[in-house]
Curated annotation (Swiss-Prot):
Residues 14-32, 131-146 have a biased composition (Basic and acidic residues). Its main location: nucleus. It is found in: Nucleus. It comes from Mus musculus (Mouse). The modification Phosphothreonine is found at T146. SMART domains: RRM, RRM_1. Residues 355-406 are annotated as: Interaction with ESR1 and ESR2. This is RNA-binding protein 39. One of its GO terms (molecular function) is transcription coactivator activity. Interacts with NCOA6 and JUN. Interacts with ESR1 and ESR2, in the presence of estradiol (E2). Interacts with RSRC1 (via Arg/Ser-rich domain). Interacts with SF3B1. Interacts with ZNF106 (via N-terminus). Residues 33-56, 64-95, 119-130 have a biased composition (Basic residues). The modification Phosphotyrosine is found at Y95. GO terms for biological process: mRNA processing; regulation of mRNA splicing, via spliceosome; regulation of transcription by RNA polymerase II; RNA splicing.
Length: 530
């Protein structure tokens, strides 16, 4: 068996060598394949490793670059912030931008960047500051008119409603011409209207048409329109100054005033005629209201005369004023000049204790009142001194009373001698004698005679013959003040039926109260004999 095994081994040996060779070859191939595979794997690993390293390096580089960029950006931002802060500090005192809030800055930085925001802040800083007022547009002058030309285009309005506004007057007078300006005179303290105003027109031709609107109702109250006398006053004052210079101050008496009239109201009425030095309105110490009269001192006597001529009889608060001259100061008035001081009015006259007791005793005489015994004893101890003080005080009181009576009497006499302010209405006296007139229709004949005469000067829109008047009065209303002035100048002083006619102006409200139908009269009358 062993031989068989050996023979078989010998026979199979060459085949085993081949197999071994094949196996070795196969093994070598497999090893080479494995080596190749391992080499390829290692190469791929190396490639992957190199790629990953490169990626990591690139990432690191990018990170470093991004960090450097961020550092540069942060540095530039800090620099720009510091610059913007310094600029803001410079401009903070002048102007604070309304866009400096965090929302606006974040929006700008996110969208348009910080440099543009800085430019924007510059532009904003150059814009107008909120503390500077906007300049009003330059108004071009309508006309280069002198004060005299403006006065010729101005009318004076009186008896205005309390609630009237400049717009109401502008609308009312726009029917006769274009209105340039309306200036209402108001109280300085209460800001309420004083019932008077000045209306300036563009054209001079509108002034007579505006005067013709006298009597028309504005907000339910009939208005009085007159021409402005400022031009005449200014011309007279200039002529007087050129000839003889200023004549010095002049004092006027103003009486028959309403008790609610104040010094500011009088100043607003009299000041257009000239500069006023002082206004003294006599006040009642008990009620604190006006006594109804006062004194106004003008710096120029001519201005005072013009004010006297124009404002005597001027109706204020429903009552016609009485304006007159005040007599010159005498020695007696100069002796009592200390009574006119404001300091004396505030402090009074100091009589002392004894003087007050003696005055109390003098006032108690004749009244049945008894003064206390202690007061009587004190008076007996120093009777002579007390009597002297009371005598001095009585002299002062009597002197003041006589002066006030003399001043008021002279002022009333002067006021009575001056004609009142011209209006559309006037009264004719001595036109007839009711006791001797017996013919039928005699009043119609007188009416026709007056109408015929007045038609020569502008006509008549209302007439009334008072048949029961002992003075023979005839009341006439003309269409305008100019017509009334012409008629009064023609009729005053003329003789009619053996008597001299006297003509006097009647305030328009008084005339309307007497004859309500005359308020709506506008048609010119003609004689009935035709």
């Amino acid at each position: 068996m062993a031989d068989d095994i050996d023979i078989e081994a010998m026979l199979e040996a060459p085949y085993k060598k081949d197999e071994n060779k094949l196996n070795s070859a196969n093994g070598h191939e497999e090893r080479s394949k494995k080596r190749k595979k391992s080499k390829s794997r290692s190469r791929s690993h190396e490639r992957k490793r190199s790629k990953s390293k490169e990626r990591k390096r690139s990432r690191d580089r990018e990170r470093k670059k991004s960090k450097s960029r961020e550092r540069k950006r942060s540095r530039s931002k800090e620099r720009r912030r510091s610059r913007s802060r310094s600029r803001d500090r410079r401009f903070r005192g002048r102007y604070r931008s309304p866009y400096s809030g965090p929302k606006f800055n974040s929006a700008i930085r996110g969208k348009i960047g910080l440099p543009h925001s800085i430019k924007l802040s510059r532009r904003r800083s150059r814009s107008k500051s909120p503390f500077r007022k906007d300049k009003s547009p330059v108004r071009e002058p309508i006309d280069n008119l002198t004060p005299e030309e403006r006065d010729a285009r101005t009318v004076f309005c009186m008896q205005l409603a309390a609630r009237i506004r400049p717009r109401d007057l502008e609308e009312f007078f726009s029917t006769v011409g274009k209105v340039r300006d309306v200036r209402m005179i108001s109280d300085r303290n209460s800001r309420r209207s004083k019932g008077i105003a000045y209306v300036e027109f563009v054209d001079v031709s509108s002034v007579p048409l505006a005067i013709g609107l006298t009597g028309q109702r504005v907000l339910g109250v009939p208005i009085i329109v007159q021409a402005s006398q400022a031009e005449k006053n200014r011309a007279a004052a200039m002529a007087n100054n050129l000839q003889k210079g200023s004549a010095g101050p002049m004092r006027l008496y103003v009486g028959s005033l309403h008790f609610n009239i104040t010094e500011d109201m009088l100043r607003g009425i009299f000041e257009p005629f000239g500069r006023i030095e002082s206004i003294q309105l006599m006040m009642d110490s008990e009620t604190g209201r006006s006594k109804g009269y006062g004194f106004i001192t003008f710096s120029d006597s001519e201005c005072a005369k013009k004010a006297l001529e124009q404002l005597n009889g001027f109706e204020l608060a429903g009552r016609p004023m009485k304006v007159g001259h005040v007599t010159e100061r005498t020695d007696a008035s100069s002796a009592s000049s200390f009574l006119d001081s404001d300091e004396l009015e505030r402090t009074g006259i100091d009589l002392g204790t004894t003087g007050r007791l003696q005055l109390m005793a003098r006032l108690a005489e004749g009244t049945g009142l008894q003064i206390p015994p202690a007061a009587q004893q004190a008076l007996q101890m120093s009777g002579s001194l007390a009597f002297g003080a009371v005598a001095e005080f009585s002299f002062v009181i009597d002197l003041q009373t006589r002066l006030s009576q003399q001043t008021e009497a002279s002022a009333l006499a002067a006021a009575a001698s001056v004609q009142p302010l011209a209006t559309q209405c006037f009264q004719l006296s001595n036109m007839f004698n009711p006791q001797t007139e017996e013919e039928v229709g005699w009043d119609t004949e007188i009416k026709d005679d007056v109408i015929e005469e007045c038609n020569k000067h502008g006509g008549v829109i209302h007439i009334y013959v008072d048949k029961n008047s002992a003075q023979g009065n005839v009341y006439v209303k003309c269409p305008s003040i100019a017509a009334a002035i012409a008629a009064v100048n023609a009729l005053h002083g003329r003789w009619f039926a053996g008597k001299m006619i006297t003509a006097a102006y009647v305030p328009l409200p008084t005339y309307h109260n007497l004859f309500p139908d005359s308020m709506t009269a506008t048609q010119l009358l003609v004689p009935s004999r035709r």
